[in-house]
């Protein structure tokens, strides 16, 4: 159903099961999949493809041009998967050129006033709380959780099941399974998240050992990575080791204060 006050370009591809609310504007090159709901005053624009069962709340702007001085008007793209929720005033921008799309996977929640800039890649089942700001070219792997008003610098990668505490900021990569506080500081492992998503006690203990080798052993990173590769071979361990080894920006540091990593939790 399309509300009579909505303005939908005749060339936009809107599935017949989508529900378009009052005063929505949908531009020419938008494709909106089955079961989507678009709330009042939302604006869908750009070369934007939105999959099934997404919910877009009031005032969200999806697919606008990037805030990048290098952008020269190319018909760059935004691709959104299925089952995501975009709350009030969320903004998501298309890529800044034709070489790469802005991409959002499936099943994520973006709370009010989140900003997702050009060329960002977001995996599945991600949660961004109110006011999170992602700069251009950021990558979030699956099941990342960023608390309210976190700031992520351009080109930063945040690994699987990582978390950021409210108001924290990063300009370096965040390894999988870790928790960020303050600015570029990690303070242990997301043990509860690992447990909830199938990492048994043996896997959690191995990850704790990898974490200590990489971030608390006082070794140079290359030496710590070599030791970790020799000793630890589980799926989670390899994910963390490979992520850290591939960094181009450096990774956040553990400075040994305010740790939330607890041995008893890791062994449960």
Predicted regions and their residues:
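Terminal amphipathic alpha-helical/low-complexity segments used for targeting or macromolecular assembly
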Residues: 1-5, 10-11, 16, 53, ...
């Amino acid at each position: 159903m399309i509300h009579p006050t909505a303005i939908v370009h005749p060339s936009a591809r809107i599935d017949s099961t989508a529900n378009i609310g009052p005063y929505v504007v949908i531009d020419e090159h938008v494709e909106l999949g089955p079961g989507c709901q678009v709330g009042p005053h939302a604006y869908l624009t750009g070369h934007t493809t939105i999959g099934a069962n997404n919910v877009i709340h009031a005032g969200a702007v999806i697919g606008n041009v990037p805030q990048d001085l290098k952008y020269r008007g190319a018909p760059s793209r935004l691709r959104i998967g299925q089952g995501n929720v975009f709350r009030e005033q969320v903004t998501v921008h298309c890529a800044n050129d034709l070489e790469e799309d802005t991409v959002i996977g499936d099943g994520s929640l973006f709370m009010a006033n989140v900003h997702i800039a050009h060329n960002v890649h977001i995996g599945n089942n991600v949660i961004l709380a109110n006011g999170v700001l992602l700069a251009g070219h950021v990558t979030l792997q699956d099941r990342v959780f960023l608390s309210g008003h976190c700031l992520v610098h351009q080109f930063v990668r945040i690994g699987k099941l990582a978390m950021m505490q409210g108001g924290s900021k990063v300009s370096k990569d965040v390894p999988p399974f870790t928790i960020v506080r303050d600015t570029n500081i990690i303070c242990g492992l997301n043990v509860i998240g690992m447990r909830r998503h199938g990492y048994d006690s043996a896997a959690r203990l191995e990850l704790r050992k990898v974490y200590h080798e990489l971030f608390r052993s006082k070794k140079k990173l290359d030496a710590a990575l070599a030791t970790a590769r020799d000793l630890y071979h589980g799926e989670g361990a390899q994910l963390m080791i490979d992520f850290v080894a591939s960094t181009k920006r450096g990774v956040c540091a553990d400075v040994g204060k305010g740790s939330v990593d607890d041995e008893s939790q890791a062994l449960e």
